[in-house]
Every structure is written in C-alpha cells, then in structure tokens.
UniProtKB/Swiss-Prot annotation:
Keyword Isomerase: yes
InterPro entries: Pro_racemase_fam
Keyword Isomerase part of the UniProt annotation: yes
One MF term in the entry's GO annotations: 4-hydroxyproline epimerase activity
Family membership noted in the UniProt record: Belongs to the proline racemase family.
Reaction equations catalysed: trans-4-hydroxy-L-proline = cis-4-hydroxy-D-proline
Major enzyme class: isomerase
Organism: Roseibium alexandrii (strain DSM 17067 / NCIMB 14079 / DFL-11)
Origin organism lineage: Bacteria, Pseudomonadati, Pseudomonadota, Alphaproteobacteria, Hyphomicrobiales
Its EC number(s): 5.1.1.8
Disulphide connectivity of cysteines: none
Active site: C85, C235
Protein name: 4-hydroxyproline 2-epimerase
Binding site for substrate: G86, H87, H205, D231, G236, T237
Function: Catalyzes the epimerization of trans-4-hydroxy-L-proline (t4LHyp) to cis-4-hydroxy-D-proline (c4DHyp). Displays no proline racemase activity.
C-alpha cells in the first residue's frame, strides 16, 4: 500500500495512493458508507500506531466521477469517516502537485459532502473554497460536570462543531492535557443533553477560542477531534463553522480576512462570501508540506498489523487481502 504523508500547519495527512479497499460501484457517498461499514479495519491500520498515531487524518484517493474534478477523496480518522477536512484538502492538493498530477491553478475535488474547489498558488500554498457552512443553534447552554454551565454555538463546516468563546485554561501546548479533558467532558455533556446537529448528527468536534499570541491574528483556538486527538492546525472545517457564526453575528463582512491561530501557533487566513441558501461559502488558505512517500507493509506474523486498538474491532479487509496475497 503506497501512502504519501504531509502536514498542513502542523496537522498530518496520510494519502492512500495505491492499495486501498475495493468499495464497489456507486456514488462517492455510497462508497464512503461502504468504507465506514465494512473497512474501518483498513482505516485503523493506516492511521493508528504502530504505523501512525491518533492525530493522523487518512485520505483515500479515488478516481473522480465528475469530468471536471481532478480527484475524489474520502477522509477518515481512527474512528469514522469525515465528511470534509480542510487541512487534508490542502495537503491533498500539495501532494497531487508533488506527484505531478496537478499544476498551479484552480482545481475541483469530489468529497462525500460535495465538490470542493482549491487554488494551488505555489508548491505549498493552497486556498480551499469549502462547502456551504452554517450555524444551526446560537448560545446553547449545557451543564458540564466540574465546570458548571458552558455556552456555545452549534455549527456545520463540513463536520459538526460546538464552538465555545471562552476557555478556563490558556490555549497553550502545555495545557493540551487539560484542554483535551475539558472538551471531552463538554462533548459528553452535549450527548447527555441530547444536543445534536441536523438529523440527530453527533457533534464530534469541540472548538474553544481565546486571545491570540500572534499580533496579526484575531483569535486562537483549540479543537478536539472525534478520536480524542487535538488538531494541530486551526482546523479548516472548524474555521468554516466559525465563519458562519461570525457572519451571522455581524462581526466579519464578506471578503474580509480573519487570521485564525491554532494551539501550536500556526495560522490560516480565512474569509467568506454569502451562501446560496442559509450560510456562507468559506475560503481557507494555508500551507502544507510533503513529509514522506512510503509503502505500508502488512506482515501476517505481525500481531499489530491491524493497528493498536480495542479488541472488538474487526479485521475483515486486511484479513481478506492477506489471504489473497499470501495464500
């Protein structure tokens, strides 16, 4: 299995170029559903230890079904598919350029939540025009054990977010353990209170905000991802959800830039245009760098060839693959 690794503003992406599972015919949405239902063993093996770690986002490269798209992609982490991933889309564009598949300029990628446009400005700099993003609920308050009442907004930026304007902890790397524990408690409180996205969707990302360290930035954030890792980047889909809230609150005008800083100090330049229905069309600009080009090896004698994970996870895809390849 060939993979190419990159990082975008510090957050890693692993693009599976060759050797992924057969997802059968159908739309990209159907293929994403097949990946999550039948091949999470593949996903875990790609992103988890000993080959990876829980902060890696996987991206399965597929042929596009639309003639005007350069590629199709399904994003995943160690638990599930992701409808969209901003940092990984930036990494995808830079990686495809590294492979010689695209040149600088505008391109379209198919994702399970819609077509995403990118502008490859140079070998490392990419602007992503994300799917339409919107705020579902403003000022939702939940009781968080040990912290009292916490208020935030529920918004969609390609994934579901609960955005909290304040944090009891300074948003620094030293406080990552405390920030992680706090945001996990918030996420559980939302679940206990029955707070969801549209169609009862799980709110799997929690985003905290605070004052920036960078004098050119307007805000600093900490983002808890679904698998329990924190986002090293400012989080593209989280920035999209943030833009939807800023727009609706009248804080940021269309086309006006906002510099969003991450917990590690990396930044995205973000802006929006009004959406066609109820939200905004975000543009996220950041940089990615290719870090490795490798082949993953699945040795039948390796007890951790499926990744280090709970014992009740299935191993159907790799088991079938190994039985074919090794008899």
């Amino acid at each position: 299995m060939r993979v190419i690794d990159s990082h975008t503003a510090g957050e890693p992406t692993r693009l599976v170029v060759e050797g992924g599972p057969d997802l059968g015919p159908g739309s990209l949405i159907e293929k994403a559903a097949c990946l999550e239902a039948e091949h999470m063993d593949f996903c875990a093996s790609v992103v988890l230890e000993p080959r990876g770690h829980d902060a890696i986002i996987g991206a399965l490269l597929l042929p596009p079904s639309q003639p005007d798209c350069a590629a199709a992609v399904i994003y995943f982490n160690n638990l599930q598919n992701l409808g969209m991933c901003g940092h990984a889309t930036i990494g995808l564009a830079v990686t495809l350029a590294h492979m010689g598949r695209i040149d600088p300029g505008r391109h379209k990628f198919e994702t399970p939540v819609g077509i995403v446009e990118v502008d490859l400005q140079d070998a490392n700099t990419v602007s992503v025009v994300n799917v339409e993003s919107y705020r579902l609920h403003k000022d939702v308050t939940v009781e968080v054990p040990g912290h009292g009442k916490v208020t935030g907004d529920v918004a969609w930026g390609g994934n579901w977010f609960f955005l909290v304007k304040e944090s009891p902890f300074d948003l620094t790397l030293e406080n990552v353990p405390a920030l992680t524990a706090y945001t996990k408690t918030i996420r559980q409180a939302l679940e206990n209170a029955g707070v969801t996205g549209t169609d009862c969707a799980w709110i799997d990302h929690i985003e905290l905000f605070g004052p920036p360290k960078d004098p050119f930035a307007q805000s600093r954030n900490f983002v808890l991802c679904p698998g329990g890792a924190y986002d090293r980047s400012p989080c593209g889909t989280g920035c999209s959800a943030k833009l939807a809230c800023l727009a609706e609150d009248g804080v940021l005008a269309p086309g006006e830039d906002w510099i969003q800083e991450s917990v590690i100090g990396s930044t995205y330049r973000i802006s929006y245009q009004p959406g066609t229905t109820k939200g905004v069309i975000p543009t996220i600009t950041g940089q990615a760098f290719v870090t490795s080009d490798a082949h993953l090896i699945f040795n039948p004698a390796d007890p951790y060839r499926f990744g280090i994970r709970p014992q009740n996870w299935t191993t159907s895809w790799i088991t079938r693959t190994l039985s074919v390849e090794h008899g």
